[in-house]
Regions:
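Detector for small/aliphatic-rich hydrophobic stretches
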Residues: 2-198
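Non-catalytic interaction/Regulatory regions outside core domains
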Residues: 16, 58-72, 375-378, 384-389, ...
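Non-catalytic, conformational "gating/processing" segments within enzyme and secreted inhibitor domains
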Residues: 51-63, 104, 144-304, 326-414
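Short glycine-rich loop/turn motifs
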Residues: 93, 283-286, 387, 425-429
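Feature captures eukaryotic membrane-trafficking machinery centered on endolysosomal pathways
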Residues: 106-130, 288-290, 416-448
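Extracytoplasmic/secreted cell-surface and envelope-processing proteins
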Residues: 127-133, 307-310, 344-346, 400-401, ...
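Short Gly/aromatic-enriched secondary-structure transition segments
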Residues: 133-137, 248-255, 310-318
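Internal alpha/beta scaffold segment
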Residues: 303-329
């Protein structure tokens, strides 16, 4: 059987994940009764659910239409993050970071953005596709993960928080989307859903505008164009703009040199300070610097002399990362850290396959039957793209991430000498949530 390629995309200003579809045998033709409004058709399905189909009605030039009009956001189950969730999320974060890191290259990911996008996507998965996704995401069943994420995202993005999060689904009129899929993503992730024609330039502009707006301009756009076979895009965007609790002053900044991963010396602007939390492990030292409000903090980890950045990153584990932060000491530490900016973009398909999530990318075997249906086509993930941005400077930090899933058819301190941590060579850094110590962003700076 000749298959038509159906592309799917996931974008995350931290990550992007695409869905796609391929041809399948027609079903038995069971009759269904539909109810149609001006913009959508609600149809009972064989499994007792309903599906929503966006209708064109001559609106090719109009703005994307809201598909959540008939869906009221409910109060989804909520489970306060605990040590079980922290261990699962930390393991996912560090495994993703290790597999994504390329030797000697600046790398930046947002595990939270990727986790959110994949958690939304797995609400539409079944069978082996679902079991593989659950394993990669830490082994929690999807209801438990939804409950944890519901509570965690609410905590992180509460009133006056420096972190903002937004989720949206963009759906082609060819797709019959399960109402239960939309409902779950509304209840647990406050996701919005819109009808979109991916062949229109206006749709590209609207989606890029959504990305730009929800990352405060840190990530300007997701794509230049979509494959004409695209049928859905699921997106998560994160934006953090935080000021240091103790900003660097002008007299604490001076020029110097940074020895990059290739051994070359390059010019850098360094920020100097004395911090009060010191990290020491068997192969690295580091410090913690807080942002205003103390909910978020910056962590910088420098491999010991004689330990390469590559071997240090290869040794990282979720358990070890949490352990290092949980055992940090209240000790004065003199720090030297370069100002830096990093923009990162990459496909996560190979990384996620390596982690054990392969069926979701297989046009013949993927099962997203709880997400949507498309006549004679099978939906699968065709790509996952991750986009991130960070800027660390005297006043604070700006960081952004966006994840999109695109579906298409295929078809009190002791008196002692201060410690010293000088980040004048490649290092690992993270922005953490100080209540769980989980990394919201994690990266490796190998060059300036």
């Amino acid at each position: 059987m000749k298959l038509k390629r159906l592309a799917a995309l996931l974008l995350c200003a931290a990550v992007m994940l695409p869905l796609a579809a391929c041809a399948k045998k027609p079903d038995s033709g069971t009759s269904r009764t539909s109810q149609t409004t001006d913009d959508t058709t609600v149809t009972p399905t064989k499994d007792g659910d309903t599906s929503i189909t966006a209708t064109d009605k001559g609106n090719k030039g109009a703005a994307a239409q809201d598909l959540m009009q008939g869906i009221t956001k409910g109060k989804g189950a909520s489970k306060k993050p605990d040590s079980r969730f922290a261990n699962v999320a930390a393991s996912f974060a560090l495994d993703l970071f290790k597999d994504e890191y390329k030797s000697g290259k600046n790398t930046l990911i947002s595990p939270l953005s990727v986790l959110t996008a994949l958690a939304m996507t797995q609400n539409g998965a079944e069978g082996k596709t679902l079991s593989e996704m659950q394993k990669v995401l830490g082994g929690l069943d999807r209801d438990t993960l939804n409950a944890y994420m519901n509570a965690y995202l609410a905590e992180l993005t509460g009133k006056d928080s420096a972190l903002k999060c937004a989720n949206s689904l963009w759906i082609d009129s060819r797709l019959d989307v399960k109402t239960s899929f939309l409902q779950k993503n509304a209840d647990f992730y406050s996701a919005q859903a819109y009808k979109a024609d991916f062949t229109r330039k206006n749709t590209v502009n609207e989606i890029n505008s959504w990305v730009n707006k929800n990352t405060n301009g840190m990530i300007k756009k997701l794509v230049d164009e979509f494959d004409p076979l695209t049928v859905m895009v699921l997106m998560n965007a994160l934006c953090l703009e935080a000021e240091w609790s103790d900003p660097y002053t002008d007299n604490c900044v001076s020029e110097g040199t940074f020895k990059n991963a290739k051994g070359n010396l390059v010019k850098a602007e360094y920020m100097y300070s004395q911090e009060t939390e010191y990290i020491e492990t068997e192969n690295a030292t580091g410090f913690v610097k807080y942002y205003k409000g103390d909910r978020f903090a910056f962590v910088a980890l420098l491999p010991n002399e004689g330990t390469s950045i590559d071997s240090y990153i290869a040794s990282l584990t979720g358990k070890g990362f949490l352990g290092a932060l949980n055992s940090r000491k209240n000790t004065r530490v003199n720090t030297q850290m370069p100002k830096f900016k990093c923009e990162y973009s990459n496909s996560l398909v190979d990384t996620l396959k390596k982690m054990g999530m392969s069926t979701a990318f297989d046009g013949n075997r993927a099962n997203f039957s709880s997400m949507a249906t498309l006549k004679n086509e099978n939906i699968y993930i065709s790509d996952v793209i991750h986009k991130t941005f960070i800027e660390v400077a005297e006043k604070g930090t700006r960081a952004g991430a966006v994840t999109a899933v695109i579906a298409a058819k295929s078809a009190a301190m002791p008196v002692e000498q201060p410690k010293e941590v000088r980040h004048t060579r490649p290092f690992v850094y993270a922005i953490i949530d100080t209540r769980t110590n989980l990394p919201l962003f994690i990266g490796a700076q190998t060059d300036i």
